[in-house]
């Protein structure tokens, strides 16, 4: 047992940790990465030991701000460190690593210990990896989904008909929600849209919306906004909705994996938590996205529908084209700018963006009874073209604490590089993965001003020297890295009519 004085450390390690001077560890039974219980007069918290020579002095224990808040202690106060019990879920994680089926108790224990931070990031990574490799059956996924939802707040609504649109993502520039949500809200449909931040893409819906307004809102604020406007566009993590999901996502993000069991549970847990009764789920299909072909997409759609039945949520899925970015803008600020331009002048907006936004909104207009079957997309267009969607979008921005902006008022990265066509020809391919990696290298989504603007898309004719796309960044160093990557991976491919000259057999 160790008695040490707490010292505040302004550091975010993504998990609970205590930083101990290596001299205090000598001759004890405590070692780096040991799990310990930190106790004070006000409570206790579990963390893993990290050793240091200089960050804290002998007799001190470095504690992260989240831990200090969790047990309500002051800097300099004495705390006690003792060995914590091994998490109950460790054998269950090993069981899943061996490809075995987990029972409800085992699944609930894993999720509970994720939320209570009894599992280290290494242990959580092992669980995520095991589901990525070995998968889960529908009973396991259903149990995991319910427990993830139960770990946080549960929002209830006065109205019975509450709907939602969700995309599983993977498509760069997937900003459709900034059009679809205000279209539906303007039609009187209740649609409280909660989104995650980017996992595998350069910008999630929450990242894009955050360029324009506050997305970290509490439950009472969301209910007030939805009562006033019929809709919202907020970050689910700001509302304590399914907090286990956000912890899992933070482990998935560095390695850009999104295991299908977690994907299903993540999406549907948020639906349970936000009181959704009807949901349309967009499954992009194509090269460079999560789902490679229509057969895979149909299989995943059936799983969403089956899971929805287990959870008493009506789910309808749509397979959409994901073979190239949606619209021309990729990255938070650029996508926000393009979305506003589309709301202001839909006739001159990218057709792919308009078509997807109208199609998804149209389905829910029909499910919600605002339009007859087959007429939803027409009604969605009327709302968009009339300016009602823009008016509703600005109302949502104001209610969430922002100020409506004109497209030209949105700030982009100061460091810019244009990539030009090397030959005359046609754009024959746009590599989603390459585009995503280039934009991430430029700094997105953390750097909201970082992004990429496409001048040409697949099938467009270009001349040598034409600008294919422009990379933006808030950092000169990040821009150089992004440009170097772009020149290695060629995310936009141009080919001439002459493919190869053959003169010998």
Curated annotation (Swiss-Prot):
Q: Name the GO terms of the biological process aspect.
A: AMP catabolic process; pyrimidine deoxyribonucleoside metabolic process; pyrimidine nucleobase metabolic process
What is the annotated signal peptide range for this record?
A: none
- Active site per the UniProt annotation: 258 (proton donor)
Q: Name one Pfam family in it.
A: Glycos_trans_3N
By its UniProt entry, which InterPro entries does this protein fall under? AMP_phosphorylase, Glycosyl_Trfase_fam3, Glycosyl_Trfase_fam3_N_dom, Glycosyl_Trfase_fam3_N_dom_sf, Nuc_phospho_transferase, PYNP-like_C_sf, PYNP_C, Pyrmidine_PPase_CS
Q: Which residues bind AMP?
A: 170, 196-201, 205, 266, 290
GO cellular component terms attached to this protein's record: cytosol
The organism's superkingdom is given as Archaea
Molecular function (GO) terms listed? 1,4-alpha-oligoglucan phosphorylase activity; AMP binding; pentosyltransferase activity
Alphabetically ordered keywords of this record:
Glycosyltransferase, Transferase
Enzyme Commission code(s) on record: 2.4.2.57
What is catalyzed by this enzyme? AMP + phosphate = alpha-D-ribose 1,5-bisphosphate + adenine; CMP + phosphate = cytosine + alpha-D-ribose 1,5-bisphosphate; UMP + phosphate = alpha-D-ribose 1,5-bisphosphate + uracil
What class does this enzyme belong to in the EC scheme? transferase
Q: What's this protein's family per the entry?
A: Belongs to the thymidine/pyrimidine-nucleoside phosphorylase family. Type 2 subfamily.
Q: What does this protein do?
A: Catalyzes the conversion of AMP and phosphate to adenine and ribose 1,5-bisphosphate (R15P). Exhibits phosphorylase activity toward CMP and UMP in addition to AMP. Functions in an archaeal AMP degradation pathway, together with R15P isomerase and RubisCO.
Q: Which PANTHER family match?
A: THYMIDINE PHOSPHORYLASE
Question: What is the official name of this protein in its record?
Answer: AMP phosphorylase
Q: Which organism is it from?
A: Methanococcus maripaludis (strain DSM 14266 / JCM 13030 / NBRC 101832 / S2 / LL)
